[in-house]
C-alpha cells in the first residue's frame, strides 16, 4: 500500500492524475517546495506537491517537505500552520460562478453542484460568486514551450531526442528555438499583468471553489502560482472518478486544504477505489 506520492506540475500533472485515480492532489503555491533534483520543464512554472488519499494527508506531507533547502533559489520558507480543527466557516470563500453554470459538455456538472450544496448546507459555508480575469491566458501557453526548449536544449542539440518515445515533445523542443525573444518577453509582461488582476480577485477571499476541468483554472493558476487542491467528488456511470478544486490565495495552502478537508468530513469519495477497468475521461486542460 502506497501512503502517498510526490508529483510535479507545470500545467496539470498533479491535478490531472489525482483526478483520474480518485485521490487528493495538492499543487502548492509556486516556490513553497524546493525543486532541487527534479527534472525541469519550465523554471517559472514547475511545482512539487503531495498526492494522497485525503486533504489532511496532503497537509501532513506538505508540512514535511515545504520550505527552502538552499539548493533552489526560487524556494521560500513561509510558515505553514495546519489546524484540521479550525472552523472552516471562518474562511472567506468564493465559487467560480460562470464555470458552474456552463452546461454544454459538462458531464460531471451535477456532481459539482452537489458539492457546492454540501459546502453550503452541511458545513455552513457562505460563498460569494467570483470570476477569473478576462484575459487571453491561452496566448501565454508558449511560455512553457520556450522554457521547456531551454531546459532540454542539450538533449535536442546532441540529437538524443531521437531516442525518446515517439511523441510531440521532441518537435516541441526543436521548434521552441524559433520563438522570438520579443514574444517571450511580452508574454511574460502580460503574465505579470494577469497576476495582478488575479490578486484582485483573491483580495477579499481566502479560497474559491471551481470545476477542476472547466473554466480554465488549471492553466490560469499555474501561470499565477496560486495553490490548488483537487479532491474526488464522484464517479461517472462507467466508474471514472471526477474531482472538484479549491484554489487558495498565494501562500494560503492551509486554507485551501482546510476547505477540502471539511468537505471530506461529510463525504466519502476519497475513501472509495475507482474501477480499474473504467473508461478514461477526456484529456484535461493541458497536463504537463
PLM segments and residue spans:
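Short glycine/serine-rich loop segments
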Residues: 1-65, 222, 226-245
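A short helix-breaking turn/cap at a secondary-structure junction
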Residues: 24-110, 266-288
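Short, well-ordered beta-strand elements
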Residues: 50, 240-249, 256-260, 264, ...
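Short amphipathic alpha-helical coupling segments at ligand-binding clamshell hinges
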Residues: 57-61, 111, 187, 240, ...
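Short helix-loop capping/hinge segments that flank enzyme active sites or metal/cofactor-binding pockets
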Residues: 87-96, 142-195, 232, 236-243
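Acyltransferase
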Residues: 106-131, 152-160, 184, 188-205
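Short connector loops at secondary-structure junctions
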Residues: 125-140, 171-173
Amino acid at each position: 500500500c502506497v501512503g502517498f506520492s510526490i508529483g510535479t506540475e507545470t500545467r496539470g500533472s498533479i491535478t490531472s492524475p489525482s483526478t483520474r485515480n480518485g485521490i487528493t492532489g495538492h499543487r502548492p503555491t509556486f516556490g513553497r517546495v524546493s525543486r532541487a533534483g527534479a527534472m525541469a520543464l519550465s523554471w517559472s512554472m514547475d511545482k512539487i506537491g503531495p498526492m494522497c488519499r485525503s486533504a489532511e494527508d496532503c497537509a501532513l506531507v506538505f508540512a514535511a517537505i515545504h520550505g527552502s533547502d538552499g539548493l533552489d533559489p526560487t524556494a521560500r520558507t513561509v510558515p505553514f500552520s495546519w489546524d484540521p480543527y479550525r472552523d472552516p466557516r471562518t474562511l472567506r470563500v468564493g465559487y467560480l460562478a460562470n464555470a458552474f453554470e456552463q452546461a454544454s459538455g459538462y458531464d460531471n456538472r451535477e456532481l459539482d453542484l452537489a458539492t457546492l450544496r454540501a459546502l453550503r448546507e452541511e458545513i455552513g459555508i457562505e460563498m460569494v460568486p467570483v470570476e477569473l480575469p478576462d484575459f487571453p491566458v491561452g496566448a501565454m501557453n508558449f511560455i512553457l514551450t520556450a522554457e521547456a526548449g531551454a531546459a532540454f536544449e542539450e538533449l535536442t542539440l546532441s540529437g538524443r531526442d531521437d531516442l525518446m518515445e515517439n511523441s510531440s515533445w521532441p518537435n516541441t523542443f526543436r521548434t521552441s528555438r524559433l520563438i522570438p525573444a520579443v514574444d517571450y518577453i511580452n508574454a511574460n509582461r502580460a503574465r505579470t499583468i494577469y497576476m495582478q488582476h488575479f490578486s484582485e480577485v483573491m483580495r477579499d477571499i481566502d479560497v474559491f471553489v471551481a470545476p477542476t476541468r472547466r473554466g480554465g483554472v488549471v492553466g490560469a493558476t499555474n501561470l499565477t502560482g496560486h495553490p490548488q487542491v483537487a479532491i474526488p467528488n464522484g464517479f461517472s456511470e462507467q466508474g471514472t472518478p471526477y474531482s472538484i478544486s479549491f484554489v487558495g490565495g498565494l501562500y494560503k495552502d492551509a486554507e485551501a486544504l482546510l476547505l477540502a478537508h471539511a468537505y471530506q468530513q461529510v463525504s466519502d469519495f476519497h475513501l472509495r477505489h475507482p474501477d480499474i477497468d473504467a473508461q478514461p475521461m477526456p484529456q484535461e486542460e493541458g497536463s504537463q
